[in-house]
């Protein structure tokens, strides 16, 4: 029955497996039952009865194990349910707070977007910023990926039941949950980044407003104190913002560290839980081993009962089963011998342990005794130690340092007094600065209100001026159009007058050339004809220059006739001189620029007078006297001359009156020209000036026509005069004509001056036209400036609103600063109280310091002596240390030799035990004389060696490569899977690749 028993015993190692192996063993089809010896059976009914009893016992054991496993599994299920409940609660809390965070961030974003729309409405469209810095708009909370149904289940509102979230988690896979949660985390990050960007945008806007306030403060006449105060407030604001950002960074860093520590705590908790689970597994293994031990104890009791029954059978029966019973008795004796050997070995080991325990207790006692001796050391021994001397040296050093500290303490006292005084002064300065800042703030508020009132007044003035300018521009439109038409017509008229003047100049040159020819002919005929022909030729040739120069003058009085009585040839000479003068005057007229015509025309009048006087002096000495030819005809023409004389005198009177009128009109023209030059260039004055110019030109044309008529009449009447009286009258008339010609030359010069002034006025008119164009351009620019002023006014109103808000904020900041100042005053009072307490403690410390300084002075001498002793002991210590270094290798060698001896002793004991076993075997050989029995016994021993020492049922078919001990593969694998990864014999640890199958043939 040993064969089937061994086959059935293969399931011994699988009894009572751990929890992790239950599922694997449930899949196996074979049920492993331990072998049991039924003993002698007489019938099949008895065999069935014993088998049923054995099955019932096994089922009872399995039932107990099953109940224990169920209890343990129930406990673990409860723990897992609790853990799942806590995990669900944490997940729900995280989900709720995450949803609250998303809602608050969305509310903040909506608030910032509404504020951004309100603030960006008055700004230019080019200055508006996008939602993000790089231009990529973030998805809206309602239009993003979060509209997916699964993510909407993952992020329910607060009113939704919490089961929906858990159901969504259970319904979706881990990958889907991870993807959706990653999208939700990206949305939260994007929303938070948008909030941060909005805060940065608000910060930039505040800085821009501050810059505008500074620029406005630079442009407006604000006080320097207010500007400095605003700058200080701006700097303080920036400092507080930097401090806030630093604190936020610090808070963020601390929160990250806190989260890391929390993660570490959670990981540690999970490790603790894992360790608890491992402890539970170990406890389960211990329970398993305990159950196995109980089972083995039961088997041992049964075996003892069977042995007793075997003794009884061997005593009662004869030789039927005698060989088998004697063999079991021998095995039992061998087991008893091995048990005795093991007991002896255990007793020896116990003796060794007791010996080591006694040595340990002795060492502990010596240690305690040395501690007590160390506590109650005498002073002399302490003084002789090197540590004491080192302490003395250190004491001397510390004494010197204490002296230095004393000096530093004195300095600190002085510094404390100085700091106290400076602190008091600083407090006074702070109070005075606070009062000054309050006054400055009040004055600044008053100034801001004044500036606001001034800005309102300026706005009203600008609005009124803008309305007036609009009305004036609307009224001046048709007037400007009329003035443009009038200016264009006057320009055309000026061009026509210039053409007429050129034509008249050309005719004047032609007439002067004809006069020269006639003079040459007259001079030739005067030499060839008789004396009677001279007066006629002279009379004919005399009026020609007058015609060309502009007409004769009035007849002179009888006194003038007597003065002008010399030779009648003076007319020709005077006309020739006038001709010579006219040519350069025309050249001068053509060479004068428009800007210099006025002064040159005025300067010709004083130059013409000496020339006329020179001609009057040269005139009598040039021509021959024609008096003899005129005496014969004087009587004939006497009556006619008297009539003509009366007519000419009347005519001359009329001409003189017209000449006076022309001179008066010329004076009026000069006055108008002076007024035009001095007065501003306006349109109505120009129109009046042009009208006066036309009138003067019309009068000049009338005078020219009348002079021509008078010349023609004079030419007709001069042919009739032949006698002396006529010649005398002619001479007088010629003198008067010459005088009138002089006046005519002066009037021509004045006319030329007037023409030049007309050119100047034309040029001035063109300049005025250009100026009108510039004025129109300026009007357009003014309109643009008015529109710009209106836009700037709108912006100023917005800035004023912002400034008012900033003013309110500054008022709140001032209140906060006042509260801070009060808190600082309280802290200052507390610091003063602390300072008083410190001064009291400082006095006590000073007293203690004086006492200690005295003690230090007393101990100074001892320190010197201790230093000398320390040097001596130092030498001795070095000597002892050298000896100790020499002794240490010897101690190490002796320790190694002792360990070697102990190892050899253990080996000797093992050899003794092995030899003892051989001796017992030899004794068995001596006892058993039969060789078959000896061989059978050796075969059993070899089989026992080939069986696994752990389960004692299976063959050895696995080796551990760490220590090369051999076991069965099932035991090794069971130990590996049960996490008992140590060799059963030598406790050497092994891994998954450290055991392999072997095949023993």
Curated annotation (Swiss-Prot):
Single biological process term from Gene Ontology: ubiquitin-dependent protein catabolic process
UniProt-annotated location(s): Nucleus
SMART domains (UniProt xref): RING
The keyword Zinc is annotated on this UniProt entry: yes
Recorded consequence of changing residue 109 to S: Abolishes interaction with RB1
Catalyzed reaction equations: S-ubiquitinyl-[E2 ubiquitin-conjugating enzyme]-L-cysteine + [acceptor protein]-L-lysine = [E2 ubiquitin-conjugating enzyme]-L-cysteine + N(6)-ubiquitinyl-[acceptor protein]-L-lysine
Basic and acidic residues biased stretches: 18-28, 602-619, 633-652
Catalytic activity, EC: 2.3.2.27
Pfam families: zf-C3HC4
UniProt modified residues of type N6-acetyllysine: 20, 355, 517
Region (Disordered): 1-32, 116-146, 518-652
Assigned GO CC terms: HULC complex; membrane; nucleoplasm; nucleus; ubiquitin ligase complex
Tissue: Ubiquitously expressed. Expressed at higher level in testis, heart and pancreas, while it is only weakly expressed in lung, skeletal muscle and small intestine.
A molecular function (GO) term: protein homodimerization activity
Keyword line: Acetylation, Chromatin regulator, Coiled coil, Host-virus interaction, Isopeptide bond, Metal-binding, Nucleus, Phosphoprotein, Transferase, Ubl conjugation, Ubl conjugation pathway, Zinc, Zinc-finger
Zinc-finger ranges (RING-type): 948-987
Record-given protein name: E3 ubiquitin-protein ligase BRE1B
Source species: Homo sapiens
Gene: RNF40
């Amino acid at each position: 029955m040993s064969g089937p028993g061994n086959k059935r015993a293969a399931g011994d190692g699988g009894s009572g497996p751990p929890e992790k192996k239950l599922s694997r063993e449930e899949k196996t089809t074979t049920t492993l039952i331990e072998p049991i010896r039924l003993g002698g059976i007489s019938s099949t009914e008895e065999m069935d009865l014993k088998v049923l009893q054995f099955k019932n016992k096994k089922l009872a054991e399995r039932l107990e194990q099953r109940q224990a496993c169920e209890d343990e599994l129930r406990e673990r299920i409860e723990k897992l349910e609790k853990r799942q409940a806590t995990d669900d609660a944490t997940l729900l809390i995280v989900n709720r707070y995450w949803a609250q965070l998303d809602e608050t961030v969305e509310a903040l974003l909506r608030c910032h977007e509404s504020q951004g729309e309100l603030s960006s409405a008055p700004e230019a469209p080019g200055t508006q910023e996008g939602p993000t810095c790089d231009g990529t708009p973030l998805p809206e909370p309602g239009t993003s990926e979060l509209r997916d149904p699964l993510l909407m289940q993952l992020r329910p509102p607060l009113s939704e039941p919490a089961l929906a979230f858990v159901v969504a988690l259970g319904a979706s896979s881990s990958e889907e949950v991870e993807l959706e949660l990653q999208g939700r985390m990206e949305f939260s990050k994007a929303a938070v980044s948008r909030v941060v960007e909005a805060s940065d945008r608000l910060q930039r806007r505040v800085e821009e407003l501050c810059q505008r306030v500074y620029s406005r403060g630079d442009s407006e006449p604000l006080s320097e104190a207010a500007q400095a105060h605003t700058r200080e407030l701006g700097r303080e604001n920036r400092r507080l913002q930097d401090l806030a950002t630093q604190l936020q960074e610090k808070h963020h860093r601390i929160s990250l560290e806190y989260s890391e520590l929390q993660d570490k705590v959670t990981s540690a908790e999970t490790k603790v839980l894992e360790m608890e689970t491992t402890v539970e597994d170990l406890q389960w293994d211990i329970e398993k081993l305990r159950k196995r031990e109980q089972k083995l104890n039961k088997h041992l009791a049964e075996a003892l009962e069977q042995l007793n029954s075997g003794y009884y059978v061997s005593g009662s029966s004869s030789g039927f089963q005698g060989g088998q019973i004697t063999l079991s008795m021998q095995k039992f004796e061998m087991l008893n011998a091995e048990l005795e050997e093991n007991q002896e070995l255990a007793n020896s080991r116990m003796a060794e342990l007791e010996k080591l325990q006694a040595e340990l207790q002795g060492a502990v006692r010596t240690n305690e005794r040395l501690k007590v001796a160390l506590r109650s050391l005498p002073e002399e021994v302490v003084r002789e130690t090197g540590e004491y001397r080192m302490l003395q040296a250190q004491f001397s050093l510390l004494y010197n340092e204490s002296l230095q500290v004393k000096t530093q303490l004195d300095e600190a006292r002085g510094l404390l007094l100085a700091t106290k005084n400076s602190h008091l002064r600083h407090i006074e300065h702070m109070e005075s600065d606070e009062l000054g800042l309050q006054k400055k703030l009040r004055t600044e508020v008053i100034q801001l209100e004044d500036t606001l009132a001034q800005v309102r007044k300026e706005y009203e003035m600008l609005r009124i001026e803008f309305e007036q300018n609009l009305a004036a521009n609307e009224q001046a439109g048709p007037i400007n159009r009329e003035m443009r038409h009038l200016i264009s017509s006057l320009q055309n008229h000026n061009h026509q007058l210039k053409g007429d003047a050129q034509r008249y100049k050309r005719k004047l040159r032609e007439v002067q050339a004809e006069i020269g020819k006639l003079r040459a002919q007259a001079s030739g005929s005067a030499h060839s004809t008789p004396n009677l022909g001279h007066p006629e030729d002279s009379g004919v040739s005399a009026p020609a220059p007058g015609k060309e120069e502009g007409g004769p003058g009035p007849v002179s009085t009888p006194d003038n006739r007597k003065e002008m009585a010399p030779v009648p040839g003076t007319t020709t000479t005077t006309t020739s001189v006038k001709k010579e003068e006219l040519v350069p005057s025309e050249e001068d007229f053509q060479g004068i620029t428009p800007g210099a015509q006025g002064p040159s025309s005025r300067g010709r009048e004083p130059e013409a007078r000496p020339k006329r006087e020179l001609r009057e002096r040269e005139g009598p000495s040039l021509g021959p006297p024609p008096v003899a030819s005129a005496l014969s005809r004087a009587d004939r023409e006497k009556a006619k001359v008297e009539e003509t004389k009366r007519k000419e005198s009347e005519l001359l009177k009329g001409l003189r009156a017209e000449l006076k009128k022309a001179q008066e009109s010329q004076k009026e023209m000069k006055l108008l020209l002076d007024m035009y030059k001095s007065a501003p260039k306006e349109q109505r004055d120009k129109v009046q000036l042009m009208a006066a110019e036309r009138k003067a030109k019309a009068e000049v044309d009338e005078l020219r026509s009348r002079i021509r008529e008078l010349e023609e009449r004079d030419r007709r009447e001069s042919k009739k005069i032949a006698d002396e009286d006529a010649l005398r009258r002619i001479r007088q008339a010629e003198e008067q004509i010459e005088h009138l010609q002089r006046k005519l030359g002066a009037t021509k010069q004045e006319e030329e001056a007037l023409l030049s002034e007309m050119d100047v006025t034309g040029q001035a008119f063109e300049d005025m036209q250009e100026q009108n164009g510039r004025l129109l351009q300026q009007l357009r620019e003014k309109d643009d400036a008015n529109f710009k002023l209106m836009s700037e006014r709108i912006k100023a109103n917005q800035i004023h609103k912002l400034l008012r808000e900033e003013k309110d904020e500054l008022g709140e900041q001032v209140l906060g600063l006042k509260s801070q100042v009060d808190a600082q005053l309280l802290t200052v009072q507390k610091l003063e109280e602390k300072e008083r307490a410190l001064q009291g403690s400082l006095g006590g410390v000073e007293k203690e310091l004086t006492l200690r300084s005295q003690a230090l002075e007393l101990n100074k001498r001892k320190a010197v002596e201790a230093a000398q002793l320390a040097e001596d002991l130092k030498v001795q210590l070095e000597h002892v240390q050298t000896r100790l270094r020499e002794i240490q290798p010897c101690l190490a060698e002796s320790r190694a030799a002792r360990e070697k001896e102990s190892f050899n002793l253990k080996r000797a004991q093992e050899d003794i035990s092995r030899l003892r076993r051989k001796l017992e075997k030899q004794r068995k050989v001596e006892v058993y004389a039969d060789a078959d029995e000896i061989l059978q016994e050796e075969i059993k021993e070899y089989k026992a060696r080939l069986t696994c020492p752990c389960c004692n049922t299976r063959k050895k078919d696995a080796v551990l490569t760490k220590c090369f001990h051999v076991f069965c593969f099932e035991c090794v694998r069971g130990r590996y899977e049960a996490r008992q990864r140590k060799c059963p014999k030598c406790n050497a640890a092994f891994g998954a690749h450290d055991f392999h199958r072997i095949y023993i043939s």
